Amino acid sequence: MNKKQKKVLIRIIAASVMMILFAFIPVEGWLEFVLFMIPYLIIGYDILLKAFKGIKNKQVFDENFLMAVATVGAIALGDYKEGVAVMLFYQIGELFQSYAVGRSRRNISELMDIRPDYANIERDGKLERVDPDEVVIGSVIVVQPGEKVPIDGVIIEGSTTLNTSALTGESMPREAKAGDDVISGCINMTGVLKIKTTKEFGESTVSKILDLVENSSSKKSRSENFISKFARYYTPAVCYGALALAILPPVVSMLLGFDARWGEWIYRALTFLVISCPCALVISIPLSFFAGIGGASNAGVLVKGSNYLETLSKTKYVVFDKTGTLTQGVFEVVGVHHSKLEEARILEYAALAESFSSHPISKSLQRAYGKEIDQSRVTDVKEISGEGVTAVVDGVSVAAGNTKLMKRLGIEYSDCHSVGTIVHMAVNGRYEGHILIADREKPNSKEAIAQLYRMGIKETVMLTGDTGKVADQVAGDLGISTVYSELLPGDKVAKVEELLSKKHSKEALAFVGDGINDAPVLSRADIGIAMGALGSDAAIEAADIVLMDDDPLKIAKAIKIAKKCLRIVYENIYFAIGVKIVCLILGALGIANMWVAIFADVGVMVIAVINAIRALFVKKL
């Protein structure tokens, strides 16, 4: 509890003790009024001040105004105990709500406790602690065992085990050695590391993640926007309704010659006011989303706003980019089928020609070549999107790519019956063979697809630039229902738009990619999910939801979290509105008294808040 909450608690205890004591003192009239005004002012002075300021600023209709009118009215009717009780229980509810929100915020802060407090820089043979913001790109920082890695960089000395659980939600540590990239927010567990920074702190992974989580509350869901608008019109409506309930029945009774019974009808109107307070909805709905986003963060699923959580819960179609999402994206050369030119020379030409590309296939060719790449040997490089590359290597014309490239160049090629990615090679316009490259499926991909179907996903779709043979085999192995192969990057956007046009307006389509070249498709889908986005700025920028590791099972987990959060939101909406409608009718009929009204207001709010906090707990999903 913070200092403000402790002060409110002391006031609640003091007012409660006084109220109980004064209830046993046999006094009446003005003395009873004076006695009960003491606990009333102790517990309610701030509510009265807020109500007065609201009236002064022409912002009349809020819960403070409702409570002030209801309690002052009850005291004016001589119902001192009820007046104090309404204010007392309202403050108890507010304290509970404040504590619950603070607790969920603390939980999220603890879960996302990845912001480093300092960075160690070596100066004159000594380690000096500096603010991470002061460290420039290219600086060498030292990270001791037990410390957080403060800034993204490359390990230049040392080896260790890194704990990435605060980022990924997974407890499995990761080995790291000299030459490996390392991201901020990880905890160094064993060895001393020297890291050369590659980013400023403000651009590092930890800063982007914290900024994403902190700003998530600004993007509100349709449910939250509905409740905000609802409260804006609902509160004035019930105030006028209560006024009508207090005035019209007595006036009609007088006109008909009956007893007006003003006191009874005013009491009913005050009860009506207390019951109608919209706190349960106004507080619990945003809290449900806030807790849901916090729970997702703990599981390594970063959600940029409650609107995305709401859309994700409606997902019925999941579209995957194959490479790096369902497969490991680690391509390996598994065979070289050559004619006259020897295998080593084909690999050399392919590796050099592809050396200017960042595509995983080019990386695999360079690994298979196994020697240092001298790019000065390569000239006139032309990369043709979705086909391959042409270049001049040591004065020799080289073409490396798929069948489309061979057809473009008018070169006759041989088909390969093995399943994998085929890189056809032509040297000086003559076909010299092909290189077979294979990607491995991720261990959990098949189970991830099965989980999606068990959750009610209607269709899974795989988009890939690979050949139909490779794509069909992967889709068949994993149980994917629809596959589109041999697509150019631009074709993927067109396919997603085609799928979007077929679905029902109340259903959502999610696209899952690894963030590499996927930004246009991530932006076009109803929900863009970037997988394994640790350290990927483009993915964090383009996606609506970021999975911090590359486990496909996290996709189903993210949808389960969204569904649980929305289920809690609707439970609170139906429960709060249902109880209030029943109690409002009973209050208007004179059946419900002020004590029932207290339950309908404070009791419902407390129950709704407790229910909302359940959204934090997602480990067993």
Regions found by a protein language model. Give the residues of each.
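Conserved cytosolic catalytic loops of P-type ATPases
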Residues: 110-203, 307-350, 392
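P-type ATPase nucleotide-binding
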Residues: 333, 337-459, 468, 480-496
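Conserved catalytic phosphorylation-site environment of P-type ATPases
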Residues: 66-68, 167, 267, 277-353, ...
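Conserved ATP-binding TGD loop and adjacent catalytic N/P-domain core of P-type ATPases
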Residues: 395, 421, 427-571, 579
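Transmembrane helix-loop-helix hairpins at the membrane interface
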Residues: 2-118, 220, 229, 236, ...
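Membrane-embedded transport module
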Residues: 241, 503-506, 543, 548-621
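Juxtamembrane coupling segments of multi-pass membrane pumps/enzymes
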Residues: 87-145, 176, 303, 373-376, ...
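Helix-interface capping motifs at the ends of transmembrane segments in multi-pass membrane proteins
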Residues: 17-34, 41, 53-62, 68-83, ...
